[in-house]
Regions:
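Extracellular low-complexity Ser/Thr/Asn/Gly-rich intrinsically disordered segments
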Residues: 1-187
Length: 187
């Protein structure tokens, strides 16, 4: 039997060990089990919805993400598994340089790849220590760029003279404020 490269025949499999004292020929028998555990079943990249956040006040395509909001989706709701995020695939495979604070991660350019969108690498570890890998795309969405210098709207006080209260149609500046952007609305 090759003890450094033994392939189990069943799962689990009991292995018996015989220890023999070479000086006095005394023998002791022990046993242990070989158990093969499956890696966790997790969502794969094409099944995971990208994590998107609006750009912060500065339009620089970087913002802070709480990556942990995706833990439940990735693990299919298994709260006993550990979810670890990495910036590179190599780090994930080696289990090094995990993102220290996944609750407050700012997207960044890594290894020549753009910061937006950014692909993160995810390792999920089950209770047996088996690991499964996937990816998570994070994307910073641009903020609308409205025109902020719309003209004042003036009306004469005809409705109830002297109370200085009138009914305005404030949508008359809407097209100017939207500034031709598609997919936005003014509220």
């Amino acid at each position: 039997v090759n003890t450094t490269s033994y392939q189990n025949l069943t799962n689990p499999q009991t292995i018996y060990v015989r220890l023999e004292d070479l000086n006095n020929d005394c023998v002791s028998i022990g046993e242990f089990n070989l158990i093969v555990s499956l890696p966790p079943v997790i969502l794969q990249p094409n099944e995971i919805i990208a994590l998107e956040e609006c750009d912060d006040e500065i339009a620089d395509e970087t913002t802070v993400f709480d990556l942990t909001v995706k833990d439940d989706e990735i693990t299919l709701g298994n709260v006993d598994w550990e979810v670890i995020y990495y910036e590179t695939e190599q780090d994930a495979l080696e289990g090094t340089n995990a993102i220290e604070n996944p609750e407050s991660y700012t997207n960044t350019a890594v290894a020549g790849n753009a910061a937006n969108p950014q692909t993160l690498y995810v390792a999920v570890v089950n209770l047996e220590g088996c690991v499964a890998y996937t990816t998570l795309t994070i994307r910073v969405l641009p903020n609308p760029t409205p025109s902020t210098d719309a003209q004042d709207i003036e009306l004469c006080d005809y409705n109830n003279p002297g109370d200085q209260i009138e009914v305005f149609d404030i949508t008359i500046n809407e097209a100017y404020i939207i500034n031709g952007e598609l997919g936005v609305s003014a509220a």
